[in-house]
Amino acid sequence: VHWSAEEKQLITGLWGKVNVAECGAEALARLLIVYPWTQRFFASFGNLSSPTAILGNPMVRAHGKKVLTSFGDAVKNLDNIKNTFSQLSELHCDKLHVDPENFRLLGDILIIVLAAHFTKDFTPECQAAWQKLVRVVAHALARKYH
């Protein structure tokens, strides 16, 4: 994947403003609420019975932070995303059996969360760069499935 200097700047510039705990928790909670079938991968998280329960669930918040922290590894390694996520791809494929389509869904949700948090900074150009990034990350995570 080739990244232009402008794309790199738009991605890293916005990433520097992201509250990983807050945005990660919101992104994962939105995934579980908007796409309820994804909840089956989080059965051990306890109460996911309603949007309020999901938003208040400490395990959802903690895992959301973990997910977005790992997404930060992509931002730091834009030129080596495939290798950055090879172990996570293996884990999600071989051990957790997560449907790779869920990576795309989470990427789309992350775009919505970023747009909601950074209305002025999230220009169409910024969105295009981030859309490319979430697509590349989803593809890297789905790699072991092919």
Curated annotation (Swiss-Prot):
InterPro entries: Globin, Globin-like_sf, Globin/Proto, Hemoglobin_b, Hemoglobin_oxygen_transport
Residues in Globin domain copies: 2-146
Tissue: Red blood cells.
Keywords of the record: Heme, Iron, Metal-binding, Oxygen transport, Transport
Family: Belongs to the globin family.
Function: Involved in oxygen transport from the lung to the various peripheral tissues.
Subunit structure comment from the entry: Heterotetramer of two alpha chains and two beta chains.
Record's protein name: Hemoglobin subunit beta
Species of provenance: Coturnix japonica (Japanese quail)
